Regions:
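Secreted/periplasmic proteins
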Residues: 2-6, 14-116
Length: 116
């Protein structure tokens, strides 16, 4: 039984992390989101933080987001839920979008950052 569990653990550790290719959007303080508005995780929204919203990744997880148009990449922390627009998989803070070099929509690759 121990050997079976060990084999399963090794298989899981060797499983490559898959990229999610989709469209990213930027969301910022303004409109219905005022400075300090709490995100779904309870953390206040701040345009200057390297954060993002994702539909299913756990709060606090980190992802590497790469802009497919220019190759720029950034690591952000998931603190909110969304986006709720078909075809989009991640909403980036203004700081995250700025680091990727876009201000509206752009195609990206999203990969969870695995830490030991």
């Amino acid at each position: 039984m121990r050997q079976l569990i060990a084999a399963l653990v090794l298989c899981l550790l060797d499983t490559p992390v898959r990229a999610e290719d989709c469209v990213a959007s930027v969301y910022a303080v303004g409109g219905s989101s005022q400075p300090g508005t709490k995100t779904a995780s309870g953390i206040p929204l701040n345009d200057n933080d390297m954060t993002a919203a994702h539909k299913s990744l756990p709060f606090g997880s980190k992802v590497k987001v790469t802009n497919q148009k220019n190759g720029h990449a950034v690591t952000v922390t998931i603190t909110d839920r969304g986006p709720y627009v078909k075809g989009r998989c991640i909403d980036l803070s203004k700081a995250g979008a700025g680091a990727l070099g876009f201000a509206g929509l752009t195609p990206v690759s999203v990969v969870p950052v695995v830490t030991d």
